[in-house]
């Protein structure tokens, strides 16, 4: 069993996680924040089970990303980046052509796509094209209406 303790505050504020995050079967998802891909890669390389939250770095080196084989990546955070639109955008805005092409690369390498933070349109695009889909940290619209929470139709797609 794996625990996904990728609290953004832990990876964003201090720049370093406690040692136990690197020694156990805990997924260490590195949040992009203001750091470069090179800096994020340094954190992720220490992890036993690396992942990335918002992999839309301008300096993204796809070969380096594939080298460490993250369990999953989120393509966006709440906003827009090179791959698509996050949940801050209208539901009809989804993945950009570069995002769709990137999913093909992730599929070829067995890396899951995390649909947390993505727009409703992006969610549809991910479901249609990604071979492995996860949702690492989102709640349910039926419990609390929020732009990031999943609607019932999305839960059906994930099930």
Predicted segment positions?
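Loop-centered beta-sheet repeat module
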Residues: 92-127, 133-138
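N-terminal hydrophobic targeting/anchoring segments and the immediately downstream early-domain regions
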Residues: 1-97, 130-133, 141, 145-159
